[in-house]
Amino acid sequence: MKILNSLKTAKTRHPDCQIVRRKGKLYVICKSNPRFKARQR
């Protein structure tokens, strides 16, 4: 999982990527290709 300052590019890396908010943090999850997972600082 990458920890990024901005998720703007992370959400467009793959068509299945979606943004989720958990415990006040923003996450990008991708079920079909989990290496695109990311979290915002």
Curated annotation (Swiss-Prot):
Biological process according to GO: translation
Entry similarity comment: Belongs to the bacterial ribosomal protein bL36 family.
Gene this chain is encoded by: rpmJ2
Gene Ontology annotations for the cellular component aspect, listed alphabetically: ribonucleoprotein complex; ribosome
Listed name of the protein: Large ribosomal subunit protein bL36B
Record GO terms (molecular function): structural constituent of ribosome
Superkingdom of the organism of origin: Bacteria
Keyword ATP-binding tagged: no
